[in-house]
């Protein structure tokens, strides 16, 4: 047999789940325990004391003659009256006995013989027989026959509900218990509930929750202009229990001290007593991450809500079923029953009168059970009314938003909303504290505090370095925000912020008087009004790297004193079919615009800065640039770079740029440059870069571009150099590296102003003597060719500082290299074995590039 405690354990849940048990569930749990006690009590009584007692219904005296027990044909049917003897004992006491005879319970002896035997045995009683009245009737049944009849009538005459009521009540109660707590046991919902309760308890006990709510209280007091006097200490409650459930009852109340924090309002000074330590901050940040992931996981489905509705419907249907059939059996339970077991051949009687000793008790227990189940059912109906009266799959934190400064707490839905509704039935303070961890403002404030703890002024100072321009530079990468101490580095020149999505630039940036360059790499920084005013007046160079054009901060287009703007990102993605740059009209002093993107046309907004723009760079990452009409309006552009734009010819719009000085068309698909003759109208053009294309020949018309000083044709498919190139008397730099050129024309000697010649990666085998007439050469790169010997006239290049010979067929170097006084070992690129062929004094002269300056100093 089981105990009450063992069965009641079906109704037990983890103590931490009690926050998800509204009052009706708790009440129904107690009612289920009472019903369980009724069922077990009734079952115990029935097993121990349930009994049916039956007596045969004897024929009446008037009909006794017609009654003859089977098997005794000679038995007299007259039922004699029972005699009572009252003999006196020796002490004078009188006893009353009923004279049944010794054969009264012997069915095989005829009644007449029994009476005759009695008369012969007790002759003295015969004279008193007529004077006494009969007090009972004989049945002639044996004890075993009574037991047999009792068992037969218990199963035949007794209603089934009287026999099985305790067991049915027990089964029904167990089903109700299981139905009430099934959502706590079902694996797919149990895991979510367990996770939710764990997070909820941690959020309730978190010092950050206490701090945040304290800030809210402080803000309310500020708004109401209520002065708080006295220094009150905000207690910080940290749970040391291993249980991750609901918070302890000893959680301290929240004092109205701290600082005011609002997403839209300035933050007042933070008292040191409310600052979280590093451990508390890390725990709070972990909670924000857990809440975010849990919300994303639970909001996807409404399984918990549906399961709770289903189990409530099951309990309601169970209540209706129990009430319907039990009400019909209340009157069926009675004390007396008539039994006709059809065992006349065994007992001699056909009808028996029986009594059920547990009838009154069972009837009272049944009425009690029905009363309890009615109360249980009404609560189920109320639960259904509550479930369908309000939208439980939506939960609004509107009240919390009104009472606190966290106006960004989002509304939730589905199972997440349902769980919060259930928690509100327990205590609304849980949801209020939980909402703090749904607020991005709260999370950002926590990150800001933790960030300022970690990145102190001293630590930031250690990360300051000097860049190639000898400027002090600070690079911050993948932080949760910009530390406040950054703005105390007043001597900083360059600030780089990379992958800081929540970057905010406060008014303190106005202290950084030396700051002129700012880098925002995937960092849509927000600025305060005072900070914007400072940047607008002082910032000179801005680099913005983005994935989508929406990441470009709007204030970028309002920096009126900006000189250089670098935009690197996708301006023509699927989400941005049209160019997304805003108007650049406010950039009144912009001189350099660098755009690295995937444009299909030159943005028309660029014309807003046309009057003062001097340099335009477009790196298109292989996307074909189709429309360049806007270039015609860039009349003051001196430098133009169109790289990786898949251009097949030189755009005609370029020929309208009368002030153009440098043109770079690197990494396109240009094959012919017949339009080069049009460059003669660009009187100021001095540098032409057509490198990394597919050009197979340089047209003779290049001779008309007489002002060219630099010409780059490297990484093309040139097989020869036309004589016209050498008519450019102002040419100072000629780069034809990595082509298929096999000979250098002797006309190269005409380039008297040539200072840099690059022929690396060709098929040149002989160097013409006229080359060495270019006495102003400083750089001569001849590597990776087929040159077999270096002429001794190399000595004429007295200004040579760099000579590349590596990758040729040379077997020795001429000693005349020593006469190139400006050439040093660092500028000579050659194999080590070739360098060793030089005379010792030449090698020593070449090695003096390091020692000579120090020697002169000494």
Curated annotation (Swiss-Prot):
PROSITE patterns: LRR (PS51450). It comes from the Eukaryota. Residues 49-163, 331-360 are extracellular. Residues 126-137 have a biased composition (Basic and acidic residues). LRR repeats lie at residues 514-534, 538-559, 561-582, 589-609, 612-632, 636-657, 659-680, 684-705, 707-728, 730-751, 753-774, 776-797, 799-820. Residues 1-22, 183-308, 387-858 are cytoplasmic. The chain crosses the membrane at residues 23-48, 164-182, 309-330, 361-386. One of its GO terms (biological process) is intracellular glucose homeostasis. Non-essential component of the volume-regulated anion channel (VRAC, also named VSOAC channel), an anion channel required to maintain a constant cell volume in response to extracellular or intracellular osmotic changes. The VRAC channel conducts iodide better than chloride and can also conduct organic osmolytes like taurine. Plays a redundant role in the efflux of amino acids, such as aspartate, in response to osmotic stress. The volume-regulated anion channel (VRAC) channel forms a trimer of dimers, with symmetry mismatch between the pore-forming domain and the cytosolic LRR repeats, a topology similar to gap junction proteins. Heterohexamer; oligomerizes with other LRRC8 proteins (LRRC8A, LRRC8B, LRRC8C and/or LRRC8E) to form a heterohexamer. In vivo, the subunit composition may depend primarily on expression levels, and heterooligomeric channels containing various proportions of the different LRRC8 proteins may coexist. Belongs to the LRRC8 family. PANTHER family: LEUCINE-RICH REPEAT-CONTAINING PROTEIN, PTHR48051. This is Volume-regulated anion channel subunit LRRC8D. It comes from Rattus norvegicus.
